[in-house]
């Protein structure tokens, strides 16, 4: 589709705009469209008719606020009311009422949905567009076989193929194929109409024998043969109306409904003029498709590229919500139909209010948001993650591909992706290439196509004209890359420019160019656009960087980057993490939890987010940045959020880094850091953990929350208040009781104490027994209690329990085992924390903060980190911040290098420090060993890059096990930290132990610590008393399991033990 925009300069669109537009499209178009499809429902006697009057539907403003929905774990939704009427046909009376259809979840200002107190987001899906596609394959004889695949709107596929004898078949499933003449006749065409509407009638007549002519005598015979080959189970079918209905349901509705997009694609591919409202496959389509297939056989026409974006469509949030709404209305129709029949049967007078229930719509959307693969929990690790998550594109999901069956060709970059799908940003692992990210300027067109903007170059007019082009159109234009940030008509363009034309990259004269790109970032996603000097990095490392920026933890003291790209402010603004002034006014009061200002004659209070937990356990917090008494304008930033400074994204820290080896502590991507990062809280972050407990009403009585827990030490209960809940502000350690709870249970007579039995015998008092089921703080959960929520729901029962949430704040400094990364894919694990006096230091006496391995740069080809490192050093000394767009070599050769060296030279001049820029080795410096004070032999690259602390922290991963649960079948320890599992000693680990000859350690690993049941029971008691651990005599359980599995295959395996002294052979039974 080709659209003309305004004639002014382009601005970066809102990053959440696609989500907002999709939801608005659903409310404005999808909702009434599905309501209009709701049929009129009659009872069995056709005396009463129920129908909806769609013209007067309305959505009511939510009764609860978004903040309360999060607090109470409710859904932020709106009630849908529609006018409905009952028409009594006998008396021609109409009873009309406004009824509640159900609740529809609403999208909030972040572009997300709030379902059961959890932020969820619906991501976009890429599907094969319905229509017809021609392709060619080689058979086993090496001969080209041409096929035409018809894809329906529901994803069903039918194929047309032509064999060696020029016979044309329709394959409606993988096994059955029928003649094209049978299919056309079954769809309503006779032989004369078929021959009159095709270009090659002689080919159709060439394989038409006498039997076929008899079958084509009537439509009934063709339908019978089609049914017999496609849907018949056995026997000879007889033509009937039920047979036609079954065929209609099994074949035509699933594989012949094209939809609006399919009809447009079919008309365009086959040069047809069938009306757009005719969305089903017609005999005319089949015949035209057959003509094109015959033309392909004769070398006429072009084959289709299935991976081209013009053959794909985007299934947005509007389509997904509309599909679920239609499904809910079908369920509602069945409910209304059954209720009407039941009311008439029991001689009751129904009303529209009694016939309709809100359950189908509400439950349909709850199951969709909870179970659908494209509905995901919003990743809120940092502000960047929130935006990027809503701009994902997935080939996976219902109707799409799977990670194990998708080919390399589908995963690869296609020329049609440029300006629409980022060639860098995708997931790593099995889903690589299947989950992508939208480019910054891409938008979704009316019929699901991805559009990208371009500037139109016109010799006649000096005005700038911007066009949005779909993938099917821009390949016919010569598209060049823009060579400047702004269109300056006074710049003399180069004579020869690189351009794109018909999926090829060419070098052409400037006069031949039709369109030009509008922005250097146009081809990239948000994550890739935040990488400075990305053009100097290998694409694989840029991919890692764009993924790792989403894993950065918000720090307690954020700092914006010295070297950036200019998109940091837009990313922070669209994330919703900032507090923005809605209109101009004056600040009256400000503190940590609110800002009060006056404007337009009113006094408004803006609440600030304080220590709110994200679903990744990071801390979301807002800090006011406007002082009291200052006047503000509309749109001005009032408060910074987590990982933002001055309204710009601030995910990491600018620290002093040296690229050099240091005693092997930075071997294989390990990182050496200074203790200054710990003591000065440079990389300190706050994390909030949530612990839940629920109270049920059991068969023995309700569970009780109390502080009086018998048989527990008073030390564990010290933080509980009189209600049995931990106090706010308490410091809790591992094992402390957070919520005291007792669960009643029925005890056996033998379990009563003697005094309890005496009371029962003499006084008849029933002594109640209860079990302690308290909420205890698990290992690694120590911290400060910052919030406690007791959500009491009405009518507490086993199905509607009360819930208590306890939130604990942890302060985590950086430590050995944490993961850090730069913005160029340079990641590493902290290996050692050195005292600052032992760190290498510069010629001005400053010790470096971090030491990276220089061998991590050449082989990985991410040279951008060197440019950022050196430019950051100059910016830190000159107190400057740089915002550099990618591909600055379009101005001149070596532009990046010249910029870095000129800034270093200027910093050296202003600070009178010649070591900052040494002409012999520019960018490097001679530094000293902090332990000895000696110079290192070689000059070293030093600088101030932007380093992030990632969410992969050692506190979440360190794990130890003494004894625990074992698998039932193999009797080996379970796997995983969550299950208190053991550490696996695999095949290669056994080889390593064998190589060192540690036989006893190897025996312990394979027997006592693993699956030898008797030996692992004996070893505990022997260790406690200090005895000698006995040698296991029989085989471990895994060997016994192998023998049993072989026996199930009728293979007997015997094993023997040979005595070390007498060499006697003893047979052992498994």
Swiss-Prot record:
Q: Does the keyword Iron apply?
A: no
* Family membership noted in the UniProt record: Belongs to the RNA polymerase beta chain family.
Any idea which UniProt keywords this protein has? Chloroplast, DNA-directed RNA polymerase, Nucleotidyltransferase, Plastid, Transcription, Transferase
Q: What class of enzyme is it?
A: transferase
What this protein is reported to do is described as:
DNA-dependent RNA polymerase catalyzes the transcription of DNA into RNA using the four ribonucleoside triphosphates as substrates.
Going by the entry's taxonomy, the superkingdom of the source organism is recorded as Eukaryota
Localization, UniProt: Plastid, Chloroplast
Name of protein: DNA-directed RNA polymerase subunit beta
> What GO molecular function annotation could you give as one example from this UniProt entry?
DNA binding
Per its record, the protein catalyses: RNA(n) + a ribonucleoside 5'-triphosphate = RNA(n+1) + diphosphate
Biological process GO terms, please? DNA-templated transcription
Q: Which GO terms describe its cellular component?
A: chloroplast; DNA-directed RNA polymerase complex; mitochondrion
- What InterPro entries does the annotation carry? DNA-dir_RNA_pol_bsu_ext_1_sf (IPR042107), DNA-dir_RNA_pol_su2 (IPR015712), DNA-dir_RNAP_su2_dom (IPR007120), DNA-dir_RNAP_su2_hyb_sf (IPR037033), RNA_pol_bsu_bac (IPR010243), RNA_pol_bsu_CS (IPR007121), RNA_pol_bsu_protrusion (IPR007644), RNA_pol_Rpb2_2 (IPR007642)
Assigned EC number: 2.7.7.6
Species of origin reads Silene latifolia (White campion)
State the oligomer form and interacting partners: In plastids the minimal PEP RNA polymerase catalytic core is composed of four subunits: alpha, beta, beta', and beta''. When a (nuclear-encoded) sigma factor is associated with the core the holoenzyme is formed, which can initiate transcription.
């Amino acid at each position: 589709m080709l659209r003309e925009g305004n004639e002014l300069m382009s601005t970066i669109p809102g990053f959440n705009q696609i989500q907002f537009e999709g939801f608005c499209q659903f409310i404005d178009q999808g909702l009434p469209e599905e309501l209009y499809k709701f049929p009129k429902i009659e009872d069995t006697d056709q005396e009463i008719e129920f129908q909806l009057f769609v013209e007067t539907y309305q959505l009511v403003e939510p009764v609860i606020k978004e903040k309360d929905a999060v607090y109470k774990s409710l859904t932020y939704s709106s009630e849908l009311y529609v006018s409905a009427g009952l028409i009594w046909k006998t008396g021609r009376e109409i009873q009309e009422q406004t009824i509640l259809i159900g609740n529809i979840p609403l999208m909030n200002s972040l572009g997300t949905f709030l379902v059961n107190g959890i932020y969820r987001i619906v991501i976009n899906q890429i599907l094969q567009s319905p229509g017809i596609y021609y392709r060619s394959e080689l058979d086993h004889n090496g001969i080209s076989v041409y096929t035409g695949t018809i894809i329906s709107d529901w994803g069903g596929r039918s194929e047309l193929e032509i064999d060696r004898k020029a016979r044309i078949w329709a394959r409606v499933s993988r096994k059955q194929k029928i003649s094209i003449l049978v299919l056309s006749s079954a769809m309503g065409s006779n032989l004369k109409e078929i021959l009159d509407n095709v270009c090659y009638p002689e080919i159709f007549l060439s394989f038409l024998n006498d039997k076929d002519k008899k079958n084509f005598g009537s439509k009934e015979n063709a339908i019978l043969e089609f049914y017999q080959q496609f849907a018949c189970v056995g026997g000879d079918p007889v033509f009937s109306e039920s047979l036609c209905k079954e065929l209609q349901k099994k074949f035509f509705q699933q594989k012949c409904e094209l939809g609006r997009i399919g009809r447009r694609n079919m008309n365009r591919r086959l040069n047809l003029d069938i009306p757009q409202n005719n969305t089903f496959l017609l005999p005319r389509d089949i015949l035209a498709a057959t003509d094109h297939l015959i033309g392909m056989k004769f070398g006429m026409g072009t084959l289709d590229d299935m991976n081209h974006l013009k053959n794909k469509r985007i299934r947005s949030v509007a389509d997904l919500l509309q599909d679920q709404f239609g499904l809910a209305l079908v369920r509602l129709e069945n409910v209304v139909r059954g209720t009407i029949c039941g009311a008439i049967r029991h001689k009751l007078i129904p009303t529209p209010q009694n016939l309709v229930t809100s359950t189908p719509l509400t439950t349909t959307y709850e199951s969709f948001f909870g179970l659908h693969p494209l509905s995901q929990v919003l990743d809120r690790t940092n502000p960047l993650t929130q935006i990027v998550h809503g701009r994902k594109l997935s080939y996976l999901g219902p109707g799409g591909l799977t990670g194990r069956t998708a080919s390399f060709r589908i995963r690869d970059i296609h020329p049609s992706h440029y300006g629409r799908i980022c060639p860098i940003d995708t997931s790593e692992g099995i889903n690589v290439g299947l989950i992508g990210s939208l480019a910054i300027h891409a938008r979704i067109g009316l019929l699901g196509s991805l559009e990208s903007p371009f500037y139109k170059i016109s010799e006649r007019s000096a005005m700038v004209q911007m066009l949005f082009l779909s993938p099917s159109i821009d390949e016919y234009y010569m598209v060049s890359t823009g060579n400047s940030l702004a269109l300056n008509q006074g710049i003399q363009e180069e004579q020869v420019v690189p351009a794109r034309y018909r999926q090829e990259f060419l070098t052409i004269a400037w006069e031949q160019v039709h369109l030009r790109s509008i922005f250097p970032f146009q081809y990239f996603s948000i994550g890739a656009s935040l990488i400075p000097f990305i053009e100097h990095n290998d694409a694989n490392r840029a991919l890692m960087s764009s993924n790792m920026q989403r894993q950065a933890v918000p720090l307690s003291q954020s700092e914006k980057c010295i070297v950036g790209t200019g998109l940091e402010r837009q990313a922070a603004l669209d994330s919703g993490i900032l507090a923005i002034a809605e209109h101009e006014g004056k600040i009256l009061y400000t503190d940590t939890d609110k800002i009060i200002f006056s404007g337009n004659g009113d006094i408004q209070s803006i609440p600030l987010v304080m220590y709110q937990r994200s679903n990744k356990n990071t801390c979301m917090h807002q800090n006011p940045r406007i002082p009291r008494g200052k006047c503000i304008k509309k749109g001005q930033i009032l408060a910074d959020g987590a990982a933002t400074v001055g309204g710009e994204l601030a995910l990491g820290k600018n620290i002093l880094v040296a690229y050099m080896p240091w005693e092997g502590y930075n071997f294989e991507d390990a990182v050496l850091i200074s203790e200054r990062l710990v003591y000065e809280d440079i990389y300190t972050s706050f994390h909030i953990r949530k612990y839940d407990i629920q109270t049920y009403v059991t068969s023995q009585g309700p569970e009780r929350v109390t502080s009086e827990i018998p048989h527990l030490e008073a030390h564990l209960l010290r933080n509980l208040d009189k209600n049995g809940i931990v106090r706010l502000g308490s410091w809790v350690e591992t094992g402390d009781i957070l919520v005291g709870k007792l669960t009643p249970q029925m005890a056996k007579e033998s379990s009563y104490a003697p005094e309890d039995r005496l009371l029962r015998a003499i006084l008849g008092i029933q002594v109640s027994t209860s079990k302690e089921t308290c909420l205890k703080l698990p290992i690694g959960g120590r911290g400060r209690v910052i919030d406690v929520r007791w959500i009491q729901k009405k009518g507490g029962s086993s199905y509607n329990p009360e819930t208590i949430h306890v939130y604990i704040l942890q302060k985590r400094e950086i430590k050995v085992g944490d993961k850090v990364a730069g913005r160029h894919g340079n990641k590493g694990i902290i290996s050692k924390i050195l005292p600052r006096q032992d760190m290498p230091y510069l010629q001005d006496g400053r010790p470096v903060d971090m030491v990276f391995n220089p061998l991590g740069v050449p082989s990985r080809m991410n040279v951008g980190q060197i440019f950022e490192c050196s430019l950051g050093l100059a910016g830190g000394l000159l107190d400057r911040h740089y915002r550099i767009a990618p591909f600055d070599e379009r101005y001149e050769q070596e532009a990046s290098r010249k910029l870095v060296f000129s800034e270093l030279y200027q910093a050296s001049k202003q600070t009178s420090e010649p070591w900052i820029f040494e002409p012999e080795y520019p960018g490097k410096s001679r530094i000293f060993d902090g332990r000895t004070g000696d110079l290192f032999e070689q000059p070293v690259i030093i600088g101030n890059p932007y380093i992030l602390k990632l969410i992969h922290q050692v506190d979440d991963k360190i794990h130890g096990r003494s004894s625990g649960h074992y698998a039932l079948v193999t009797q080996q320890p379970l796997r995983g930290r969550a299950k208190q599992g053991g550490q696996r000693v695999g095949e290669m680990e056994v080889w390593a132990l064998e190589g060192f000859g540690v036989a006893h350690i190897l025996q312990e690993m394979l027997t006592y610590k693993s699956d030898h049941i008797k030996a692992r029971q004996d070893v505990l008691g022997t260790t406690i008393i200090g005895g000698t651990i006995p040698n296991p005599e029989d085989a471990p359980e895994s060997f016994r399991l192998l023998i049993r599995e072989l026996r199930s295959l009728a293979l007997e395996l015997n094993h023997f033990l040979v005595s070390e002294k007498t060499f006697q052979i003893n047979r052992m039974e498994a």
